[in-house]
Amino acid sequence: MQCVNVELKERRYPIYIGEGLLTDSSVYPLKSGDKVMIVTNETIAPLYLETVTDTLNQIGCQVSHVLLKDGEKYKTLGSLNQIFTALLQENHGRDTTLIALGGGVIGDVAGYAAASYQRGIKFIQIPTTLLSQVDSSVGGKTAVNHELGKNMIGAFYQPITVIIDTTTLNTLPKREVNAGLAEVIKYGAILDYPFFEWLERHIDNLVALNQQDLQYCIARCCRIKADVVARDETEKGDRALLNLGHTFGHAIETHLGYGNWLHGEAVAAGSMMAAALSEKLGNLARTDVARVEKLFARANLPTLSPDGMQPEDYLPHMMRDKKVLAGKLRLVLLKALGQAYVATDTDPALVLDAIYACTQTD
């Protein structure tokens, strides 16, 4: 088992990474008599709800659960209200701990519920997808979607512990594994060139779910993100760098309808658009753009804009991005592999050219 600590100004919390942790009571920061509500979904519940419940019962916790529908399209105020209703019906108070058992959607919705219920209760992240293990479970971003934009309603709210059991990836559909690798590749591209080179050597092992490489990879991603979050918890500076490809990607998700493309798939295509724009600005060599493209392709991820979405469709969605300031786009771009920066006033015509460069032509 590995442990990565997230060091915040006022406190710290651990991220435990290893095999079989769902049944390891020592990683749960709970004691006998504690009240716990598990938030999960209809896909994860048959796989892991009983296992986690049994572990909590062994500790002596009072355990209940709430079951949400599975998928990005259920990352809504309706799902949030479903959690609140369950908490209220069972008379849960401020001493309750909420546990998010599932992927990024469950973590985001449950985290926002924990941030909001009675002005804040404790919560634990147990991410079961690769994307949530390397990214969304770490750092305290919680949110639900609005029909006009992704993650528009939310809060920064940190868990007290993150428990990453890598054996949960064995039940993950291949498409979901690949989607998680988009965020993995992102880390190397923005902040860690040696890690990018490691990925070029090991990406096939990650696709094949090699446990040794997976645990190394997840821990490294968590360390990168933990370091960034420690410096900038509420995304007023460096933390924005973690959003490579996300402004383009969120436009894809919103335009197509949540869930048609997985988040990681949209991030992969969006990262290629960011790389293409970086090249057009004279920052990134064409050979490096090709390396990024090859790595995404080896992870079976899209590198082009989806069919049915025109380049002109992007900008209206992108102008609603949370990083927009004074009506101007702020985009995460690359100076070089492993060196990202925030471009504060990019010519929209150049942005459109980059999108065209990543659009399939007949």
Swiss-Prot record:
Family label: Belongs to the sugar phosphate cyclases superfamily. Dehydroquinate synthase family.
EC nos: 4.2.3.4
Binding site for Zn(2+): E183, H246, H263
Gene Ontology CC terms, in alphabetical order: cytoplasm
Protein name per UniProt: 3-dehydroquinate synthase
Key words of the record: Amino-acid biosynthesis, Aromatic amino acid biosynthesis, Cobalt, Cytoplasm, Lyase, Metal-binding, NAD, Nucleotide-binding, Zinc
Provenance organism: Actinobacillus succinogenes (strain ATCC 55618 / DSM 22257 / CCUG 43843 / 130Z)
Keyword Zinc: yes
GO biological process: amino acid biosynthetic process; aromatic amino acid family biosynthetic process; chorismate biosynthetic process
GO MF annotation terms: 3-dehydroquinate synthase activity; metal ion binding; nucleotide binding
Pathway entry: Metabolic intermediate biosynthesis; chorismate biosynthesis; chorismate from D-erythrose 4-phosphate and phosphoenolpyruvate: step 2/7
Domain of life: Bacteria
Role of this protein: Catalyzes the conversion of 3-deoxy-D-arabino-heptulosonate 7-phosphate (DAHP) to dehydroquinate (DHQ).
Cofactor requirements of the protein: Co(2+); Zn(2+); NAD(+)
Residues at which NAD(+) binds: 70-75, 104-108, 128-129, 141, 150, 168-171
NCBIfam families noted in UniProt: aroB
Cofactor note: Binds 1 divalent metal cation per subunit. Can use either Co(2+) or Zn(2+).
Catalytic activity: 7-phospho-2-dehydro-3-deoxy-D-arabino-heptonate = 3-dehydroquinate + phosphate
Residue ranges of coiled coil: none
Subcellular location: Cytoplasm
